[in-house]
């Protein structure tokens, strides 16, 4: 038997994304979201790869810097209006996972499981992020 939302308040993340105009996002077998076939994926500059594999650090800012470098952005900060999404394919043996550079509006307020929650389960370590104190939120 599956859970039924008695008040009808739970919103499927794919439905929420489609309501925002983002199509092509798929649910992974682990309950995460894969943006690789969505127009939410960064495509502003030629030569930039918006899907990269990095070694997880336990710190959002460090992960974002690593992903920026690996993507070929040649900058420390993530492009304005975009955020790096930790796909839910974290490998505890290699400590690596896939990052996808997507529009913030396709990530903000969309509940999903991601590589960060897999990292926490595998290591027992919480991810850190200075912006979290100001209300920003990364992947779980």
Please identify what each model-predicted range represents:
Residues 11-83, 87-140:
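Nuclease and nuclease-like effector domains acting on nucleic acids or nucleotide cofactors
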């Amino acid at each position: 038997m599956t859970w039924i939302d008695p008040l009808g308040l739970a919103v499927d993340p794919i439905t929420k994304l489609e309501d925002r105009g983002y199509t092509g996002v798929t649910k992974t077998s682990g309950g995460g979201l894969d943006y690789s076939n969505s127009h939410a994926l960064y495509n502003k500059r030629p030569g930039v790869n918006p899907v990269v594999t990095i070694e997880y650090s336990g710190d959002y800012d460090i992960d974002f810097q690593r992903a920026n470098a690996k993507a070929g952005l040649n900058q420390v900060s993530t492009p304005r209006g975009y955020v790096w999404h930790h796909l839910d394919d974290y490998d505890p043996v290699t400590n690596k996972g896939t990052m996808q550079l997507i529009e913030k509006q396709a990530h903000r307020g969309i509940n999903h499981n991601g590589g960060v929650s897999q990292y926490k389960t595998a290591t027992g370590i919480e991810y850190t992020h200075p912006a979290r104190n100001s209300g920003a939120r990364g992947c779980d």
